[in-house]
Amino acid sequence: MMPVDDLQEIPLSKDTTEKSKHTVRAAGAVLWRDASEHGGTTGHPATVEVAVIHRPRYDDWSLPKGKLDQGETEPVAAAREIHEETGHTAVLGRRLGRVTYPIPQGTKRVWYWAAKSTGGDFSPNDEVDKLVWLPVDAAMDQLQYPDDRKVLRRFVKRPVDTKTVLVVRHGTAGRRSRYKGDDRKRPLDKRGRAQAEALVAQLMAFGATTLYAADRVRCHQTIEPLAQELDQLIHNEPLLTEEAYAADHKAARKRLLEIAGRPGNPVICTQGKVIPGLIEWWCERAKVRPETTGNRKGSTWVLSLSDGELVGADYLSPPDEK
């Protein structure tokens, strides 16, 4: 088991209820834009501006956030809430931790991400009547809630402008022992196909651009809906199968780094006996400690890179699991 990063694992505020009746899931973001055109280094914390919103209902200044809609994952909700509250589209990056606090219904749990604005215009609405873009120090003063300020401090603690590599374990595909044909051709089952469809919005929230899959039908099928959405081909990767990894893990590592070094945000879909070893090796190499670990079918590792170096590794459960 890889060590846990204390910075990310500890909730920003603790639930003080003895027994929660219900957990309300929500997601939010530090929405940022580059202000380097005014003089500075692109993506440096000192030259970015972050969005702080005013909600007339509460008369407060806070970060964009909101509850999940039915069937949504936290990353999808974060991207949607950003657009609804600020008018901006955005690409998610590093996960910044979670806030939990008691509410009358039980407990509210909010996961936050860094989110780079890709454009848009704010229009006042019933939920948000003002938006200001501020340097980090000024935003820290503007935010009213201590938890929001803690999230913002986490945002600037590590590189702001990052590239993302998305490593996906293929969706469910029945049991190997029950499949009579060539296991390389074993397809996704009904749940696996649903996972593949649900992964589209989640992977697009992180700006997925290029697609790679281990040489297995189920790996290709897992990202086929995304390939159709992006109108992209899926590159076949023989070096990233379980058998190839067991035979030559160094070749698989080299291939992973080659893909990560290419332009864009790649999605790499592979198998359950490949992912843990690759993630652990890269994290140890970069001295990155993931907040949580996992390897469920349909799950995703969101790997954040800055100047080619791994700076964050976030595990996301399958989209059909809470």
Swiss-Prot record:
Region of interest: Disordered: 1-21
List, for all copies, the residue spans of the domain called Nudix hydrolase.
Answer: 22-156
The UniProt keyword set, sorted, is:
DNA damage, DNA repair, DNA replication, Hydrolase, Magnesium, Metal-binding
Cofactor(s) required, per the database record:
Mg(2+)
Binding site residues for Mg(2+) 1: K65, E85, E127
Q: What is its EC number?
A: 3.6.1.69, 3.6.1.58, 3.6.1.61
Where, in this chain's numbering, is substrate bound? R55, P56, R57, Y58, D60, K65, G66, K67, Y101, K108, E127, Y145
Top EC category: hydrolase
Q: Does the keyword Manganese apply?
A: no
Q: Which Pfam families match?
A: His_Phos_1, NUDIX
The way its activity is modulated is described as: Ap4A hydrolysis is inhibited by fluoride ions.
The cofactor remark states:
Can also use Mn(2+), with lower efficiency.
Know anything about its domains from the record?
Contains an N-terminal Nudix hydrolase domain, followed by a linker region and a C-terminal histidine phosphatase domain. The C-terminal domain is necessary for efficient catalysis by the Nudix hydrolase domain.
State what protein this is by name: 8-oxo-(d)GTP phosphatase
- Naturally occurring in which organism (per UniProt): Mycolicibacterium smegmatis (strain ATCC 700084 / mc(2)155) (Mycobacterium smegmatis)
